[in-house]
Curated annotation (Swiss-Prot):
Gene Ontology cellular component list: cytoplasm; extracellular region
Gene3D superfamilies assigned: Exo-inulinase, domain 1, Glycosyl hydrolase domain, family 43
UniProt organism field: Aspergillus niger (strain ATCC MYA-4892 / CBS 513.88 / FGSC A1513)
Gene giving rise to this polypeptide: inuE
Pfam families: Glyco_hydro_32C (PF08244), Glyco_hydro_32N (PF00251)
An example Gene Ontology molecular-function term: inulinase activity
Coarse class of the protein's main subcellular location: secreted
Protein name: Extracellular exo-inulinase inuE
Active-site positions on this chain: 41
Subcellular location: Secreted
rRNA processing as UniProt keyword: no
Family matches, as PROSITE patterns: GLYCOSYL_HYDROL_F32 (PS00609)
Amino acid sequence: MARLLKAVTVCALAGIAHAFNYDQPYRGQYHFSPQKNWMNDPNGLLYHNGTYHLFFQYNPGGIEWGNISWGHATSEDLTHWEEQPVALLARGYGSDVTEMYFSGSAVADVNNTSGFGKDGKTPLVAMYTSYYPVAQTLPSGQTVQEDQQSQSIAYSLDDGLTWTTYDAANPVIPNPPQPYQAQYQNFRDPFVFWHDESQKWVVVTSIAELHKLAIYTSDNLKDWKLVSEFGPYNAQGGVWECPGLFKLPLDGGSSTKWVITSGLNPGGPPGTVGSGTQYFVGEFDGTTFTPDADTVYPGNSTANWMDWGPDFYAAAGYNGLSIKDHVHIGWMNNWQYGANIPTYPWRSAMAIPRHLALKTINNKTTLVQQPQEAWSSISSKHPLYSRTYSTFSEGSTNASTTGETFRVDLSFSATSKASTFAIALRASANFTEQTLAGYDFAKQQIFLDRTKSGDVSFDNTFASVYHGPLVPDSTSMVRLSIFVDRSSVEVFGGQGETSLTAQIFPSNDAVHARLVSTGGATEDVRVDVHNITSTWN
């Protein structure tokens, strides 16, 4: 018998309220976070009938990981979000949980290949990992072992509000492929999409501890055939999870390439502790992903990092958008300390949605990201602060009081004599508390320094400095766009080829900023600061 998750019941269990105050300390004002409780990976990202759906790993019963369900939020512009009732509630929640709903994805089955559609209604189909904490015989008659991870599906006929699990045959991919069936406890995170050229559904899922991805195809989302494997390549310092596979335009033209993304935990970017996300560029023929030669490196630590900071993980892409409009969202936290960040009554936020494309930069096909929200509706038209300096002498100059939520556009010459140039953000009046975002000229690296960013007491690795490579542009200029919220900083460098994302937990009165040039003068400086208003109002 199928299991229907009714919105009214789930709503009561989840404690969803019609009116809520999003003004707590550290509450991001233009980053999505749940009203309360624990959140991690973004799941089931789907654009359908003018609505962006954001599902996410969620504990409806507390601020720590557990009872993992699929939370749900919707938006018409990737900016203003409305939290919805829990979509998939852990089976047995409130007593003995027998199945949790781990990460996955969702599609609109517009041709009703699954047969779930009725009365002309398009079925939305979610594919997720069923985690079984106890050995059991399932409604489908299948047996599973304790701690088994398998791939299952559910469908919705009301545009994602309520979901019916496919209990007659779940899980639809019960075990890892041979010869990896001993990995049944680490087989997870299906990303499913429609492949036009082959007219088939494709899903990529992780065999986590082996640093492998398994690729399957299907005609109907129910019956799956293994067609290839990918990996291990590049960074292998921790498990591989939360994979993605998608096509992007190259250099804004008609040429395209395919991209695989894979989360890694631990073993993230150099200088970080904990999780990160790497990517590969290549070709996909409907069954096999072949990486480009220059996207694979010798050894098992070098990688193409999607973000070089500590707080961008489990990045997932939207189904339902054209390839030129591709958008990804990442979890803005880190498994190293995620359970201990000082927020209440919620824990974790999502990073800014990012538009993805491929560009040839320094003769290499490179993933570029641009922050995508309805900026015209929340960002001030005129800057709060704007200055230009033909020469910015060694030392510092205070900027205006910037507040808690703003964007900084900063550019300067790469031929400067300085060793570093930076802006101190979310700083106290005496600058004993501050976060520094800037550039190291000799190393050609962006850096983000949160060692004095506020509360760093909850984890001994949190107070750190992070770096990401950025070669100056063809005019020998360095360009940074920096997005600051109440508890986060996201830096985008150049054309978006380098980003660094980090949480910070500053004092409420840390609203000051200043420019700092060390080791000499910085040339051709321009800085513009724009206010960003709350999306929760």
